[in-house]
Amino acid sequence: MKKYFVIALASLSIISCNRQLTTALKSSDKDFILNTANEFYAQKKWSNAIALYDRLPNLVAGTDDAPEVVFKLAYANYYDKNYRLAGHQFKNFAGTFLNDPRREEASYMAAICYYQDAADYNLDQTSTESAINMLQDFLNNHPNSDKERAEDANKKIDELTQRLETKYYEQARRYFRMADYRAAVTAFENLLEDYPSTKLRQKSFEHIMKAKYELGMHSIYDLKKDRLESAIAFSKDVERDYPDTNSSKEAASMREKLLKELDRHLKVIEENEKRKAEFLEKQREEELKKREKEEEEK
């Protein structure tokens, strides 16, 4: 019985809210609409509050109520998880109400909305880059912001930056798994250039080492020497930067094989050059004999 009573009360509450919303939406009384919107806002009925706040900007333009309406509309959309729209509204507030004491908060919340809207690392990262820019702009424009807010912004920038690093690392790793070693090397090198302090640096070095090893050991003749020498040089970089690690040991092991392959390849080059020289010499001698014979026949 109690269960049905609770359901009945909930139904009556919904009907009452809907009636209240409908009445306010049909009204042209600014104060009535605003008060009703504020009631829904206080009750955390965000969609109802949004519907009414959306009606108010033109009605309150130029009045003291205007900043409050824009500010609460932005927050209502934020709480309703309409992050992109809320971010635009907070940004608009900060750019419009320059002397409002909540301007810094609005700038901060605009950045937070972009942060909330940022995609997972395996999706397009345009929103993530926008969020980083917004958070950095907030720090630049509000250097005297309270410590907690500044620390939170920096923390979120680090988090989003790591998300980008992971995105580009996984892209590079995908090239590596596909055995597209040239593309893998380029992608890992771009990652290290763009994010020199990345926590994925050592793993990137390991993949570059392996990719260069594969390129050198299985290269075509004309490119083999340069690729072997490049892999050998990089193995030394790995040992220098990560001494006494598995990465260093693996690089040393690869270098030993690379040096043997380079030595073998240099001998092949030497032999080919020798044969080429012999062929050219023989060709020259034959040409000389041909000319001598032609001279005798004259």
Model-identified regions with their sequence ranges:
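Sec-dependent bacterial lipoprotein signal peptides
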Residues: 1-17
